[in-house]
C-alpha cells in the first residue's frame, strides 16, 4: 500500500455545548458522531481514534442523527444541522464521505434533526424522510431520493419554538408520525396523510420546555418518551384501538387521547395514553434515548430500556420490572467533583453494553457494562479536548508530549499511551495542569516539566510538574522514571490544589495530604456546600478519566511575573532555557515593549521598546543570538544579544534591524514568524496573504552595511496567514520545509531555498484535504523536535511530525513524508 505524503495521526476534540450534538451508530463497531465547532467528527470508541472529519458547515454544529436501518445494521447515512441555517445529509462508504447534500431553507440556526427510511407508494423504493427544527419557529420535512432533495412541507409554530423532533411509523401502517416538543411543555403529533403532515393532537403534562422526544416500537405498540426541564420523564403509549365497540363496565381507565387516520381508505382510531412518569433526576432532563434494536443469535431484539441524561450530572438507565411492570431505575452513573454543569446528551452503543454522555464543558463520559456482573458499569477511556478555540501549543523538548492552551480557560497535556505487549499507540489527555478563571492565550516551555502561560490578565504564571504526574507519565508512556527525575529536585510536591475563590494552584507536599474517611467524604457532597478540592494522589496505568483530570492533575504554580500593563498576548523562551520574552496587548509604544525575564531569578532583565502596537509573536533564533518580534503595526524588529563580560550579569539585547511603514513588505498585521534551523533566515506571515523570507542574519555583520532585506519572492498563499513554522530538518534536496497555517483552516507545506532566480525559490509540496483541514483559523503550528524519536518504516522513509491548533476547538498531529517533499 502506497502511503500518502501527509497524514493525520491523532485528533483531540470534544462535542459542542449543544443538546443533540452526539449520535452513536447502532450495531457492533458503530462509530460515534459528534459536532466539534463547524465540523462533524467520526470517532471509533473501540480503537480510540478519530476516523475522519466531515467538513461542510460554516457555523457551529448543533445536532446530528444517524438514520437507523430497520434491521439494526450499521447506518451509512447521517444528518446534521448547524447555526449556518443548513441541514446536511451525509452519505458514507467505508467510513468516508461518498457524497453530501445541503438542505437549505431555514432562516435561523437548526437545533434538532431526525430521519427515517420510508418506502415510496408507487415503486416501493426506500428514501430518507428528514425533519428539522430551527429557531425560525418552523419544522421542515424533507425527502431525499438519490441525489434529489425537496422540501415536502413547512410546519409553522408562530411565536413558539420547537426544541426537539422525532420521526417513526405508526404500527401496522406505513404512515409516518412526527413528534415535536416545544417551549410550552407540549408535544405535537403529526401524521402524514395523502403526502401531507396533519396535526392530530397535542400531549400536555410537562410544565417546562421539552428537551427530548424519541419513539420506539415494542410489538404492536409505539412508545414515545419525552423529557423536560421540569425534571421529569414521561412515557406515552400509542396503539390502534379495536374497531369493535366495547361496553363500559364501570372500571377505572386511564384518560385516552384519540385521533383517526385513513390508511388505504380504511379509517383507524389511534389512542395515546400516559404509560408512566419517571422521577429520579434533580435537575433539568436534557436527553433521552431508547436502546436500539440488535440481532442476537439471528433474532432481532428490541430491549425495553431507556437512558436519560440530566443537568444534575447523572445518567440513569430505566427499565420496567419483569414481575410488576413498574419502571425502575436500574443503573445510575455520573460525574463527581469539579466545576461542571451536568450532561447535555446520552446514547447507547455496542448493542447496549456501553453508554455515553457529553457534558456542558465538552467532556465525554463512557461506561461499559461488566460481562461478569451486568449491574456493574465501569468508566472507559474516551477522546477529550478543548471546548473553545485553542490559542497556542508547544512540544516538550524531547517530543514526547504536547501542551495546549485555550480560551476555555484550561491548559491540557496530551501524551502517547503505550500499552504493554501491544504495538498500537494512541494519544490521550493525561493531565490538565491549569484550570483558570481567565481565557488563556499563550504558553512556552521552560524545560521538560516546567512551562509559563499567559491569559487575559497582566500576570504570567509559571508551573512545574508534581511528582505524581511524573510517576504516572512514566507508566503511561513507558518512559524511565529515573531518567525523568535525574535533574529534578528531590523535594518535588506531590500535586496541587486550588483554594476556594482562588486562581493559583497551591503545591501539596506529602506532609500536607490527608486521607479522608467515608464519613468525611460524605461531608464533601453538594448538600454541605463546595469546599476546597482536596488533592488525592493516584497511581495510574492508563489515561485518567474526566473526574481525575478535573481535580488530581493540576501542576503547582511556582512563580508569578508582574510587569505588563495589559493582558498578556505572547510569550516565548530561548533555547538555552535562561530567558523568557513576553508581550501584552498595546495601543501605545510604552505598553508594546517586550519584557525579558531571567528563568533563574525570575526578575526582569530588560525592556525592549520599538513597536507601537501589540507584538503578536516572538521567536529566539536557534543559536539564541537574536530575538525576532512581529507586530500588529505591520513591522518586525530584530534584537541582537550582546556578549557580557561576566557570568554574573544577565545578557542584554540591542536593536539590530527593523522595518518601518516604508520598508515593510507586509500591508496588514503580521501574525506569525519563525527561524530557519541554521539561524540564517527568518520567515514572516501576514494577514495580507503573504509569506516572506528575510536575511541573511549574521551577528558579526554591521546592519548598516548589510541590511536585512527580503531574500525570497513574495509567496501569496491566497488566504490570510495566521501561523508559520519551519521544520528543524531539511528535505533530501537540502531545502527548508515551511508549514503555513491559513485563516480558512487549511495547512500548506512549502519548500524554500535561496536561488539566483527568485521566482523559482518556493515549491508547493502538499496541502491538507478538506477532511484533514481545520474548519476555522489556524492559531499555531509547531514541528516536533528531531531530538525525539523519528519513526522509520521498513523502506527507510523518515516521517516528520507537527501539531496544529485552531479556533475550531481542535488539536491535530500530522505526519509528513520527508522524502516526498
From Swiss-Prot:
Q: Which Pfam families match?
A: WD40 (PF00400)
- According to its UniProt entry, this protein's organism is Rattus norvegicus
Oligomeric form and interacting partners: Component of the elongator complex which consists of ELP1, ELP2, ELP3, ELP4, ELP5 and ELP6. Interacts with STAT3 and JAKs.
Keyword Chloroplast assigned to the entry: answer is no
GO CC annotations on file: cytosol; elongator holoenzyme complex; transcription elongation factor complex
Family assignment?
A: Belongs to the WD repeat ELP2 family.
WD repeats (start-end): 56-100, 105-152, 160-200, 205-246, 280-328, 338-377, 385-424, 435-473, 563-607, 610-649, 665-704, 716-760, 773-821
Q: Write down what this protein is called.
A: Elongator complex protein 2
Question: What GO biological process term is on the record, naming one?
Answer: regulation of receptor signaling pathway via JAK-STAT
> What would you give as a GO molecular function for this chain, any one?
RNA polymerase II complex binding
Q: What is the lineage of its organism?
A: Eukaryota, Metazoa, Chordata, Craniata, Vertebrata
Per the record, the pathway is: tRNA modification; 5-methoxycarbonylmethyl-2-thiouridine-tRNA biosynthesis
Q: What does this protein do?
A: Component of the elongator complex which is required for multiple tRNA modifications, including mcm5U (5-methoxycarbonylmethyl uridine), mcm5s2U (5-methoxycarbonylmethyl-2-thiouridine), and ncm5U (5-carbamoylmethyl uridine). The elongator complex catalyzes the formation of carboxymethyluridine in the wobble base at position 34 in tRNAs.
- Name the UniProt key words of this record, in alphabetical order: Cytoplasm, Nucleus, Repeat, tRNA processing, WD repeat
Amino acid at each position: 500500500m502506497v502511503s500518502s505524503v501527509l497524514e493525520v495521526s491523532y485528533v483531540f476534540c470534544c462535542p459542542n455545548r449543544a443538546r443533540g450534538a452526539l449520535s452513536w451508530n447502532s450495531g457492533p463497531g458503530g462509530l460515534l458522531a459528534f459536532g466539534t465547532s463547524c465540523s462533524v467528527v467520526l470517532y471509533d470508541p473501540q480503537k480510540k481514534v478519530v476516523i475522519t472529519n466531515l467538513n461542510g458547515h460554516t457555523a457551529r454544529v448543533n445536532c446530528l442523527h444517524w438514520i437507523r436501518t430497520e434491521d439494526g445494521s450499521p447506518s451509512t447515512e447521517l444528518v446534521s444541522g448547524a447555526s449556518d441555517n443548513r441541514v446536511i445529509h451525509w452519505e458514507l462508504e467505508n467510513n468516508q464521505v461518498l457524497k453530501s447534500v445541503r438542505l437549505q431553507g431555514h432562516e435561523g440556526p437548526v437545533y434538532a434533526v431526525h430521519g427515517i427510511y420510508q418506502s415510496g407508494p408507487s415503486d416501493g423504493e426506500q428514501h430518507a424522510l428528514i425533519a428539522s427544527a430551527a429557531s425560525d419557529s418552523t419544522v421542515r420535512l424533507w425527502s431525499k431520493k438519490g441525489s434529489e432533495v425537496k422540501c415536502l412541507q413547512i410546519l409553522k409554530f408562530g411565536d413558539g419554538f420547537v426544541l426537539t423532533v422525532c420521526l417513526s411509523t405508526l404500527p401496522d401502517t406505513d404512515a409516518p408520525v412526527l413528534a415535536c416538543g416545544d417551549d410550552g411543555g407540549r408535544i405535537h403529533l403529526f401524521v402524514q396523510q395523502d403526502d401531507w403532515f396533519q396535526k392530530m393532537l397535542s400531549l400536555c403534562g410537562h410544565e417546562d420546555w421539552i428537551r427530548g422526544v424519541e419513539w420506539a416500537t415494542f410489538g404492536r405498540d409505539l412508545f414515545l418518551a419525552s423529557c423536560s426541564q421540569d425534571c421529569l420523564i414521561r412515557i406515552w403509549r400509542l396503539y390502534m384501538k379495536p374497531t369493535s365497540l366495547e361496553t363500559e363496565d364501570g372500571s377505572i381507565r386511564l384518560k385516552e387521547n384519540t385521533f383517526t387516520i385513513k390508511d388505504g381508505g380504511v379509517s383507524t382510531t389511534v389512542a395515546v395514553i400516559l404509560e408512566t412518569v419517571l422521577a429520579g433526576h434533580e435537575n433539568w432532563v436534557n436527553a433521552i434515548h431508547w436502546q436500539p434494536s440488535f440481532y442476537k443469535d439471528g433474532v432481532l431484539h428490541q430491549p425495553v430500556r431507556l437512558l436519560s441524561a440530566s443537568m444534575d450530572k447523572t445518567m440513569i438507565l430505566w427499565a420496567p420490572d419483569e414481575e410488576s411492570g413498574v419502571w425502575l431505575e436500574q443503573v445510575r452513573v455520573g460525574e463527581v467533583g469539579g466545576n461542571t454543569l451536568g450532561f447535555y446528551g446520552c446514547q447507547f452503543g455496542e448493542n447496549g453494553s456501553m453508554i455515553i454522555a457529553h457534558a456542558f464543558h465538552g467532556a465525554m463520559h463512557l461506561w461499559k457494562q461488566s460481562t461478569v456482573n451486568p449491574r456493574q458499569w465501569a468508566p472507559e477511556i474516551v477522546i477529550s479536548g478543548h471546548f473553545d478555540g485553542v490559542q497556542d501549543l508547544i512540544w516538550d523538548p524531547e517530543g514526547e508530549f504536547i501542551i495546549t492552551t485555550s480560551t476555555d480557560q484550561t491548559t491540557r497535556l496530551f501524551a502517547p499511551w503505550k500499552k504493554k505487549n501491544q504495538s498500537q499507540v494512541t494519544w490521550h489527555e493525561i493531565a490538565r495542569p491549569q484550570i483558570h478563571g481567565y481565557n488563556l492565550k499563550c504558553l512556552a516551555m521552560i524545560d521538560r516539566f516546567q512551562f509559563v502561560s499567559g491569559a487575559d490578565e497582566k500576570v504570567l504564571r509559571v508551573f512545574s510538574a508534581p511528582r505524581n504526574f511524573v510517576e504516572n507519565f512514566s507508566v503511561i508512556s513507558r518512559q524511565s522514571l529515573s531518567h525523568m527525575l535525574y535533574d529534578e529536585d528531590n523535594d518535588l510536591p506531590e500535586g496541587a490544589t486550588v483554594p476556594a475563590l482562588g486562581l493559583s494552584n497551591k503545591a501539596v507536599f506529602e506532609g500536607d495530604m490527608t486521607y479522608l474517611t467515608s464519613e468525611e467524604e460524605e461531608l464533601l457532597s453538594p448538600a454541605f456546600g463546595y469546599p476546597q478540592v482536596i488533592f488525592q494522589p493516584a497511581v495510574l496505568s492508563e489515561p485518567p478519566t474526566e473526574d481525575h483530570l478535573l481535580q488530581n492533575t493540576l501542576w503547582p504554580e511556582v512563580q508569578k511575573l508582574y510587569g505588563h500593563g495589559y493582558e498578556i498576548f505572547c510569550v516565548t523562551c530561548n533555547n538555552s532555557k535562561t530567558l523568557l520574552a513576553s508581550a501584552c496587548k498595546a495601543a501605545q509604544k510604552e505598553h508594546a515593549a517586550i519584557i525579558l525575564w531571567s528563568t533563574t531569578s525570575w526578575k526582569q532583565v530588560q525592556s525592549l521598546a520599538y513597536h507601537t502596537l501589540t507584538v503578536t509573536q516572538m521567536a529566539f533564533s536557534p543559536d539564541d543570538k537574536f530575538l525576532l518580534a512581529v507586530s500588529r503595526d505591520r513591522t518586525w524588529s530584530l534584537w541582537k544579544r550582546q556578549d557580557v563580560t561576566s557570568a554574573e550579569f544577565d545578557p542584554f539585547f540591542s536593536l539590530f534591524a527593523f522595518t518601518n511603514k516604508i520598508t515593510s513588505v507586509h500591508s496588514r498585521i503580521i501574525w506569525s514568524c519563525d527561524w530557519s534551523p541554521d539561524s540564517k533566515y527568518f520567515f514572516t506571515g501576514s494577514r495580507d496573504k503573504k509569506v516572506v523570507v528575510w536575511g541573511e542574519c549574521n551577528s558579526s555583520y554591521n546592519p548598516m552595511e548589510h541590511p536585512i532585506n527580503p531574500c525570497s519572492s513574495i509567496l501569496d498563499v491566497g488566504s490570510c496567514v495566521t501561523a508559520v513554522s519551519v521544520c528543524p530538518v531539511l528535505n533530501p534536496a537540502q531545502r527548508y520545509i515551511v508549514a503555513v497555517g491559513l485563516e480558512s483552516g487549511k495547512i500548506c507545506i512549502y519548500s524554500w531555498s535561496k536561488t539566483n532566480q527568485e521566482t523559482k525559490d518556493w515549491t508547493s509540496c502538499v496541502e491538507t484535504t478538506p477532511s484533514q483541514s481545520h474548519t476555522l483559523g489556524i492559531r499555531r503550528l509547531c514541528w516536533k523536535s528531531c531530538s525525539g524519536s523519528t519513526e522509520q518504516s521498513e523502506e527507510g522513509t523518515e516521517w516528520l511530525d507537527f501539531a496544529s491548533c485552531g479556533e475550531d476547538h481542535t488539536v491535530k498531529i500530522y505526519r509528513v513524508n520527508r522524502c516526498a517533499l
